[in-house]
Amino acid sequence: MQAATETIVAIATAQGRGGVGIVRISGPLAGQIAVAVSGRQLKARHAHYGPFLDAGGQVIDEGLSLYFPGPNSFTGEDVLELQGHGGPVVLDLLVQRCLELGARQARPGEFSERAFLNDKLDLAQAEAIADLIEASSEQAARNALRSLQGEFSRRVHALTEQLISLRIYVEAAIDFPEEEIDFLADGHVLGLLEKVRTELSTVQREASQGALLRDGMTVVIAGRPNAGKSSLLNALAGREAAIVTDIAGTTRDVLREHIHIDGMPLHVVDTAGLRDTEDHVEKIGVERALKAIGEADRVLLVVDATAPEAADPFSLWPEFLDQRPEPGKVTLIRNKADLSTESIGLEESADGHVTITLSARTGAGLELLREHLKACMGFEQTAESGFSARRRHLEALRQAGQALEHGHSQLIHNGAGELLAEDLRQAQQHLGEITGAFTPDDLLGRIFSSFCIGK
């Protein structure tokens, strides 16, 4: 535990007027401030109703005073909460009184930062506080709460413990060469390594789902000109976000629209029609479309169900196959069902490809697409599964997986225990970045500075 020398204060409730406003104080002067403001000694962990006093003994407000001596508090330090009326003037006067008594204004996220530094929370849990506050759907809020309760951290710690056990075995064999352990023939190391890689892959998959729920899924609408891409964007957005005409090539640039489906955020990107063209401006639009396809979380490949080439849509644009994400992230949209003989519906092939037949113009089948996109974001997770994750967590997991893959290759092809030991160390370090065990100070500063003041 790190002892803080400064006492900090901030308004913990949202800006503006409200029924209740909270001023939070943390640090060694919290107890003295409690006596000065409330005019009496406060019993620990009890709510005391009474006046809040200024320096002259005049009443600023009336409300509840709660004192939590450290280390049994949110920050691990002495903490005081003053819960009064939610008027900004009253709250500012309370903060000013605390400043007069020796506290200083807290930085954004400093309360959570102190909780982290005092081992009350790890870094993933601290970030989950902000995620819970900013959650835009019930599922995102549930996931953030599970991360705050330590679910994500437990998964990471379990992987770390397995890596430590594996490192002990490998490094002991290196330190005692007289034992002459053949890592490859032994089978024990390879078995443990495969187990860790499998479990890491599972955590990566669940973390990716959690990140989509938190940050929103980027959905790129792609296809040939006049397939109805812009009409589909307008239908999803519920407004005329894109110009729609019968002229092929109307959309020449990337158009972005941010929407919510049952509170779940989606970043929908309409792109230029994919075709060979001599038009310089349209050619740039096609290049940008292909780039957007490569960066998408999900691609909606839109085809005109009335066109002859719709029978084999993936042959419409060969470069699409090179730029698109993995096959499971592509949904085929057979549009203009109102002009064809096809029935509205959703089909899933044996290889996992999903095809949705709809009409963007009439809206028929649009609800199927919405439900499909919600499922892609993890909307169907139960309350007992899933956790919140951020992009930096995904990157740390990716790098850990990369290190394990390299170590596995070294073991299989070279039987190189020394190189495997280094890869295991790197994988452990990358996992430690998630919980804060191995995190540079500048990164910590960036993370906590993004929090609300008073959190």
Curated annotation (Swiss-Prot):
InterPro entries for the chain: G_TrmE, GTP-bd, GTP-bd_TrmE_N, GTPase_MnmE, MnmE_dom2, MnmE_helical, P-loop_NTPase, Small_GTP-bd
Pfam families documented for this protein: MMR_HSR1, MnmE_helical, TrmE_N
Keyword hit for Magnesium: yes
Binding site for GTP: 226-231, 245-251, 270-273, 335-338, 359-361
Entry keyword Nucleotide-binding: yes
Domain TrmE-type G, first and last residues per copy: 216-378
Domain of life: Bacteria
GO molecular function, one term: GTP binding
Cofactors (names): K(+)
Cofactor note: Binds 1 potassium ion per subunit.
Compartment(s) where it occurs, according to its Swiss-Prot or TrEMBL record: Cytoplasm
Binding-site residues for Mg(2+), renumbered to this chain: 230, 251
Protein's GO biological process: tRNA methylation; tRNA wobble uridine modification
Keywords, ordered alphabetically: Cytoplasm, GTP-binding, Hydrolase, Magnesium, Metal-binding, Nucleotide-binding, Potassium, tRNA processing
Binding locations of (6S)-5-formyl-5,6,7,8-tetrahydrofolate: 24, 81, 120, 455
Top-level EC class as recorded in UniProt: hydrolase
List of residues binding K(+): 226, 245, 247, 250
EC number from the UniProt entry: 3.6.-.-
CC per GO annotation: cytosol
Family, as annotated: Belongs to the TRAFAC class TrmE-Era-EngA-EngB-Septin-like GTPase superfamily. TrmE GTPase family.
Assembly mode: Homodimer. Heterotetramer of two MnmE and two MnmG subunits.
Function: Exhibits a very high intrinsic GTPase hydrolysis rate. Involved in the addition of a carboxymethylaminomethyl (cmnm) group at the wobble position (U34) of certain tRNAs, forming tRNA-cmnm(5)s(2)U34.
Official protein name in the record: tRNA modification GTPase MnmE
Species whose genome carries this gene: Pseudomonas aeruginosa (strain UCBPP-PA14)
Gene that encodes it: mnmE
